[in-house]
Amino acid sequence: MLSESSSFLKGVMLGSIFCALITMLGHIRIGHGSRMHHHEHHHLQAPNKEDILKISEDERMELSKSFRVYCILLVRPKDVSLWAAVKETWTNHCDKVDFFSSENVKVFESINMETNDMWLMMRKAYKYAFDKYRDQYNWFFLARPTTFAIIENLKYFLLKKDPSQPFYLGHTVKSGDLEYVSMEGGIVLSIESMKRLNSLLSIPEKCPEQGGMIWKISEDKQLAVCLKYAGVFAENAEDSEGKDIFNTKSVGLFIKEAMTNHPNQVVEGCCSDMAVTFNGLTPNQMHVMMYGVYRLRAFGHVFNDALVFLPPNGSDND
């Protein structure tokens, strides 16, 4: 969703500032992770507004209908309160969402992966999604239940990206020689990347179930290793100003950092106007974010989006 000004971010700020005030997230100053300026991976940016304005109205309508995002949520029974929150909030904006659980949960409908191992859950979820929906969706977004996502901003970022190309997007982190997309910020794969990954899942030499190492590594690193064998490399997603749009922390933490580092530019210094994800939220904060992003409006400010992504048919989204 594209706005004439930073009204979107201000809406988020007005809602999420209550999270920061209520939770009082400690007094420890936390940096913005391991974002470095000498990454070897590509930095992919969102399209400029001018490019969108050049598209005819008919083409915009066609684009809004053609972008279909399938959301994958990996959950465990202990996450039931977070599970409920994401089910009631942002996942309603996905074109399709499935919850993949480590075991059967009576309270919510889910697909039982029959394992507590997050890497095995991720593998099985990706295989299920590809086998069942490869002809229906061109982008696949995987997240934790602690993540809040603005799907319209994701679609806007992907607007000029070709899903027939091997995209593997999100917030990139470097670990030794391995560059990977952090699961904490959400992981986006194009249908081409899904095809390549699926072709490797049955080849233990290239994509082992246990990582092929003496010690266990995280599921997002193991995914990167498998994709690397398929010629798919991690790419950091940024807005047109170079700010990260997949965030591994909450808005509250970003605001605290901005108040310390940029006291005269808290809003501008916090995060991107076109942010796609924030992580580390409680169930209550999920609902506050939902209010700030989709409900709160400043009277007198005109929203003039050049492109509107239509909600899925029958969706109960906001």
From Swiss-Prot:
Compartments, record wording: Membrane
Intervals, Lumenal compartment: 27-318
This protein's record includes keyword Transmembrane helix: yes
A molecular function GO annotation: glycoprotein-N-acetylgalactosamine 3-beta-galactosyltransferase activity
Swiss-Prot/TrEMBL GO biological process terms: protein O-linked glycosylation
UniProtKB keywords: Chaperone, Membrane, Signal-anchor, Transmembrane, Transmembrane helix
Similarity-based family: Belongs to the glycosyltransferase 31 family. Beta3-Gal-T subfamily.
UniProt protein name: C1GALT1-specific chaperone 1
Source species: Bos taurus
